[in-house]
């Protein structure tokens, strides 16, 4: 069984180099693919020097987004004979046992398309997995306050996520996951119409529709420092929110088949949330 990992770099050379150095001696990883997503800094000159028998560096001609960049790496890995491929944001950290635990799930279940472990932030808070939602529930999940109020309707019960070494879920956190060659070739991986945000839901939808299952491995975890390229390149909170809302609207139309009236309500909710984001941003700037 051969396994690779894709690291997507966009103006985040420091984190990318750190992660590469941590992973390069892991025997469980046959190959490391670093995709430079048309960085505008000095990444290219440094990354070119990493090319060797274990590391392949791919330079995208233009930045077409998070999904498109990772798909470049996936396609390279599977065309070169890999059976499974992880992706990892540059600002993540792993122990080698993490990869072994995740891969073990593919061997134990049938029709597994995607697996990930628990994600932890630097403060120990965990983000795990969540169900695919109807239009109404998806609307409720957009707002920070409604998400908290209706959390019992929007997320898996804690007991469910802790009952077994791995559990079937719909959506996995996107900062690191592992996809099988078969599932990628059948679904095409990420929807490249989405530049940034909503990728987790989209790939969850595509896999389920193709008959594949996603699992959360509950006995392993990785660290996500959340200091990556998105916050570096999009420093404005309002700017990030606008980009998120563009993807939310696209997801509602394309994958939830939202009608005209539903899209109207979505735009109203988004306008309120954007206003709250602007006020919060102004408060932080004082």
Model-predicted regions and their roles:
Residues 204-284:
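Active-site-adjacent helix/loop segment of glycosyltransferases
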Residues 134-169:
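Short, flexible, basic/aromatic active-site loop/helix in glycosyltransferases
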Residues 60-80:
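Glycine-rich, basic loop-to-helix element that forms the pyrophosphate-binding segment
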Residues 81-93:
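Short beta-strand-to-loop acidic/aromatic patch adjacent to the donor-nucleotide binding site
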């Amino acid at each position: 069984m051969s396994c690779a990992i894709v690291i997507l770099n966009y103006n985040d050379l420091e984190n990318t180099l750190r992660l590469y150095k941590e992973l390069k001696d892991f025997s469980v990883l046959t190959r490391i693919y670093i995709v430079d997503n048309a960085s505008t800094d000095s990444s290219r000159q440094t990354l070119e020097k990493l090319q060797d028998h274990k590391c392949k560096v791919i330079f995208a001609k233009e930045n077409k987004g998070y999904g498109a960049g990772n798909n470049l790496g996936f396609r390279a890995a599977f065309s070169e004979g890999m059976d499974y491929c992880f992706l990892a944001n540059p600002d993540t950290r792993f122990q080698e046992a993490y990869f072994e635990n995740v891969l073990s799930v593919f061997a134990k279940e049938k029709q597994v398309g995607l697996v990930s472990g628990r994600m932890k932030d630097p403060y120990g808070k965990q983000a795990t997995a969540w169900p695919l939602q109807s239009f109404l529930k998806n609307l409720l999940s957009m707002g920070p306050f409604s998400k908290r109020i209706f959390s019992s309707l929007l997320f898996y019960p804690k007991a469910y996520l802790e009952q077994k070494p791995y559990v079937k879920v719909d959506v996995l956190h996107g900062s690191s996951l592992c996809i099988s060659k078969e599932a990628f070739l059948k679904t095409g991986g990420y929807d490249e119409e989405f530049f940034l945000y909503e990728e987790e839901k989209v790939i969850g939808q595509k896999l389920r529709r193709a008959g594949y299952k996603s699992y959360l491995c509950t006995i392993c975890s990785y660290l996500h420092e959340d200091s990556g390229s998105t916050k570096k390149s999009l420093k404005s909170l309002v700017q990030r929110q606008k980009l998120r809302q563009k993807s939310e609207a696209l997801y509602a139309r394309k994958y939830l088949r939202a009608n005209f009236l539903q899209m109207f309500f979505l735009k109203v909710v988004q306008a309120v949330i954007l206003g709250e984001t602007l006020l919060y941003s102004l408060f932080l700037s004082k």
